[in-house]
């Protein structure tokens, strides 16, 4: 998994933050109010109502679970929730909370109606999760004092608070934890027009000059993800300042992204390497994952966790019982003639695919 994480961090079209410097950059561009938050209309509309109702009753907002692919704005929404409620936000992540005492220290320092944001909440340890249950339901925690026969349990009362949990893997949450969230919201990929609005807003904050056509060109290659759109904007801005007097047009954006090896649908070299291997080395598939990994010189986990999800989600790749198969979209993307349906069907089921 270390190598997988390393490759993900090195890709300019990675949906996860590539560095601590990028996280600082993201914070500077983060919208501060729901009115400034672009996209996710359904989730935004729900939160507007729930937040206003909680404020009118002078109560904490119900606990909120935000899930969906990385880079879509879960952390941003957590900050907006706290700001709209007019309370403090304390932020941590599941892997950081190793002991029950770590969580207890956070909870006991919360003020009334504060927001506690736990990123990667699916990675909480079972011990920490057990402490969290009574805190969420009754605003109380039980802690053990002393050791051995002298040990005793002490119940501590907490201030009412709101937990905002974020995860990219909602299926890994335990049922007892999931059931304690009153508000559950899934964040979806953005369309090109929404991303273009985000790019124009970010460009304004960066004092970058961008045409609507330039913003749309960046948006189309951002894989439906605001984090990627903002990262590409930074690189295109650099290119424009050196090669185009600082003005980002569609042509400038296209030239900059071509230099970065990001093609018109947002594929990078690794995406194309995988798809071209299936097309040219395995006649479009099916091909087993181990054979494919050997053919492109990557680890199996890297293919499954880093490369494949977006290709499958966009319809360029299929997983079948016999292995990976390139779709008609893939043939069209590379300007190739697709095999006729009869040959494709025989290839899918009759050609040995390897392990």
From Swiss-Prot:
What Gene Ontology cellular component terms go with this record? cytoplasm; Holliday junction resolvase complex
Question: What domain of life is recorded for the organism?
Answer: Bacteria
The EC number of this protein is 3.6.4.-
Per UniProt, DNA binds at: 300, 319, 324
Major subcellular location class? cytoplasm
The record's annotation in CDD domains points to:
AAA (cd00009)
Q: Alphabetically list the UniProt keywords.
A: ATP-binding, Cytoplasm, DNA damage, DNA recombination, DNA repair, DNA-binding, Hydrolase, Nucleotide-binding
Q: Name one GO biological process term.
A: DNA repair
Q: Which SUPFAM superfamilies match?
A: P-loop containing nucleoside triphosphate hydrolases, Winged helix' DNA-binding domain
Q: Where is this region: Small ATPAse domain (RuvB-S)?
A: 191-261
Q: Which GO terms describe its molecular function?
A: ATP binding; ATP hydrolysis activity; four-way junction DNA binding; four-way junction helicase activity
Q: Name the Gene3D superfamilies on file.
A: 1.10.8.60, P-loop containing nucleotide triphosphate hydrolases, Winged helix-like DNA-binding domain superfamily/Winged helix DNA-binding domain
Where found in the cell? Cytoplasm
The entry's Mg(2+)-binding residues are 75
Q: Where is this region: Head domain (RuvB-H)?
A: 264-355
What the entry says about domains is: Has 3 domains, the large (RuvB-L) and small ATPase (RuvB-S) domains and the C-terminal head (RuvB-H) domain. The head domain binds DNA, while the ATPase domains jointly bind ATP, ADP or are empty depending on the state of the subunit in the translocation cycle. During a single DNA translocation step the structure of each domain remains the same, but their relative positions change.
What's the stated role of this polypeptide? The RuvA-RuvB-RuvC complex processes Holliday junction (HJ) DNA during genetic recombination and DNA repair, while the RuvA-RuvB complex plays an important role in the rescue of blocked DNA replication forks via replication fork reversal (RFR). RuvA specifically binds to HJ cruciform DNA, conferring on it an open structure. The RuvB hexamer acts as an ATP-dependent pump, pulling dsDNA into and through the RuvAB complex. RuvB forms 2 homohexamers on either side of HJ DNA bound by 1 or 2 RuvA tetramers; 4 subunits per hexamer contact DNA at a time.
Q: Please give the subunit comment from the record.
A: Homohexamer. Forms an RuvA(8)-RuvB(12)-Holliday junction (HJ) complex. HJ DNA is sandwiched between 2 RuvA tetramers; dsDNA enters through RuvA and exits via RuvB. An RuvB hexamer assembles on each DNA strand where it exits the tetramer. Each RuvB hexamer is contacted by two RuvA subunits (via domain III) on 2 adjacent RuvB subunits; this complex drives branch migration. In the full resolvosome a probable DNA-RuvA(4)-RuvB(12)-RuvC(2) complex forms which resolves the HJ.
- Tell me which PANTHER family the record gives: HOLLIDAY JUNCTION BRANCH MIGRATION COMPLEX SUBUNIT RUVB, PTHR42848
Name this polypeptide is given:
Holliday junction branch migration complex subunit RuvB
Which species does this protein come from?
Answer: Burkholderia ambifaria (strain ATCC BAA-244 / DSM 16087 / CCUG 44356 / LMG 19182 / AMMD) (Burkholderia cepacia (strain AMMD))
Q: What is the lineage of its organism?
A: Bacteria, Pseudomonadati, Pseudomonadota, Betaproteobacteria, Burkholderiales
């Amino acid at each position: 998994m270390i190598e997988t994480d390393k490759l993900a961090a090195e890709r300019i079209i990675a949906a996860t933050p590539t560095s601590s410097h990028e996280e600082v950059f993201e914070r500077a561009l983060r919208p501060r109010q729901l009115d400034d938050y672009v996209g996710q209309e359904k989730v935004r509309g729900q939160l507007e109502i729930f937040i206003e109702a909680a404020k009118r009753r002078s109560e904490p907002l119900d606990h909120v679970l935000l899930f969906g692919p990385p880079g879509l704005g879960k952390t941003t929404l957590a900050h907006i929730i706290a700001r709209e409620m007019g309370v403090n936000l304390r932020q941590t992540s599941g892997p950081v909370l190793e002991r029950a005492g770590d969580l207890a220290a956070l909870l006991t320092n919360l003020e009334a109606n504060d927001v506690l944001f736990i990123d990667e909440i699916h990675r909480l340890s079972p011990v920490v999760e057990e402490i969290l249950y009574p805190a969420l339901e009754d605003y109380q925690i039980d802690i053990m004092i002393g050791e051995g026969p002298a040990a005793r349990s002490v119940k501590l009362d907490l201030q009412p608070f709101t937990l905002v949990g974020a995860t990219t893997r909602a299926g890994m949450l335990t049922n007892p934890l999931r059931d304690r969230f009153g508000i559950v919201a899934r964040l979806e990929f953005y369309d090109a027009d929404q991303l273009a609005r985000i790019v124009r807003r970010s460009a304004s904050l960066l004092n970058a000059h961008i045409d609507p056509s330039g913003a749309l060109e960046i948006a189309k290659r951002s894989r439906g993800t605001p984090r990627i759109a903002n990262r590409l904007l930074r690189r295109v801005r650099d290119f424009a300042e050196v090669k185009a007097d600082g003005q980002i047009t569609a042509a400038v954006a296209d030239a900059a992204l071509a230099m970065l090896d990001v093609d018109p649908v947002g594929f990078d070299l690794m995406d194309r390497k995988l798809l071209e291997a299936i097309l040219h080395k395995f006649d479009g598939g099916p091909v087993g994952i181990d054979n494919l990994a050997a053919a492109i010189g990557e680890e199996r986990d890297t293919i499954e966790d880093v490369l494949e999800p977006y290709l499958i989600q966009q319809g360029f790749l299929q997983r079948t019982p016999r292995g990976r198969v390139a779709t008609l979209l893939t043939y069209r993307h590379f300007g190739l003639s697709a095999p006729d349906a009869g040959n494709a069907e025989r290839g899918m089921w009759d050609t040995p695919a390897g392990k």
